[in-house]
Amino acid sequence: KDGLKWTPVKSAVTDDLWAITFAKNQFVAVGADGTVITSSDGYNWTKTAALSPGQTLKNIVYGYRDNDYFMTQGYFMTISKNGDTYKSHDGVTWEKENMKFASNISSVIYANELFIAVGTNGRIMTSPIGFGEWLSWLDRYSQTTENLYSITYGGGRYVSVGANGTIMISDDLSRWTIVDSGTKSDLSAAAYGRGKFIVVGLDGTILTSSDGRTWSPAAKK
């Protein structure tokens, strides 16, 4: 409840779990072998789906427009040119969708009524619809060919991070600027909270920034 003290609970599965979100009064987590589990309280979990054997679901995001859905983007653990994308209204019943370049996506977020996806070779795509109309995804010019692993939004600014210390910022998703991260380590995740961006990566890298443009290593205790 405070983020400091944690209690182990049984998840109802033995598969590795990769991502979790909370919406519509429930937690939904996804992981290896297409596993989807749900919980209303975080203590008691139920396996609701096995979307595709041998497939790892690495990301899940919730967004709302005309219709609200959970969306989880699947990534094959083996080398493949194809990726599977699923949508769900309730987190229990899932429908497979066709999404071009899905296998190249690393992360998806929902911000400002847009689904925003980042992936290999600097790919950034946005969609104002997201569900049922996958051809509406628009490629954005990102200024880099480095693989992108994560994106976040806060304080009126988008921040995307990736391989070799790549950090890019944008206020409108159309014009991106590469900024100096001060590291060459791969950066795997970005988040925003309490007026600050936080980025983490390999070799124990933790960076913080108040504006997304100037970054400093976090103090180690």
Q: For each of these PLM feature ranges, what is it?
A:
Residues K1-K221:
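Residue-level hotspots at or immediately adjacent to binding/recognition sites across diverse folds
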